[in-house]
Amino acid sequence: MNKGELVDLLATKADTTKKVANTLLDAFIDSVTAAVADGEKVTLVGFGSFEARERKAREGRNPKTGDKMDIPATVVPAFSPGKMFKDAVSGR
């Protein structure tokens, strides 16, 4: 499912227009992105949590040459699914 299909589904389920559904989806994405970028954890009970996680610096290898190289520490976005979401996906 792509964004357009999700907007169509949201508009149908919320009994609203596609324009309103698209605006709400964009606002949700922007809000979660901004909160996680500011170091906040966004939790939607039953669905899951969005947060920033720190990856430690480590040593890697260049796949072409085999030379060792340092990979710096970085912060990445992460999603942890909630119990209701996991149960729905697994068919329980």
Predicted features and spans:
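Strongly charged
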Residues: 1-92
